Amino acid sequence: MTKKYHLDSLIIETITTKLSGIQAIYRYGSAGSIYERPESDIDIAILAAHIVPYYKIINLASTLMGATGRDIDLQDMQKLPVTLRVQIVLQGERIYCAARVAAETYDSHTLSEYVRLNEERHLILKDIQQRERIYG
C-alpha cells in the first residue's frame, strides 16, 4: 500500500507528462518518512518501457526541482545496480503504476537477481575467509 506524500501527485503528473512509456514511479529515501527533514531531497526512480537517455533524466530532474522547490535525485531503474534497485523495491513506495504486470515482473526479477548476487558473494567471501587473504 502506498503512503500518500504531499508532492506525489505533482511528481507523477510532471513525469508522466514529460516522458512517454512510464510503467512505474518509485519514491524512496527519507522524503515522506519519519526521517524527512526540511532540507531532504526527494529520491525518485522511474521504470520505463525503454531506457531513458541521460539528458532526459537531467532535464526532467531540473523540471521537478522547479515544480517542487526541492532537490530531486531522479534515477532510471534500468540503469541502477541491483543493490540499489532492491532497496528501492523493498523500502521505497511505488507511487504510480501504469503497467502493474510489468512493474511486478521487474520487481521480482530484481529480487531474484539480488538473491543470485548474494549466493555468488557468499562463495567468494567463504573462499577469502578460508584462505585468510584476498589476493593470491
What do these predicted ranges mean?
Residues 43-46:
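Short beta-strand->loop micro-motif that forms the acidic, two-metal-ion catalytic signature
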Residues 1-24, 32-38, 49-136:
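Catalytic core of pol beta-like nucleotidyltransferases
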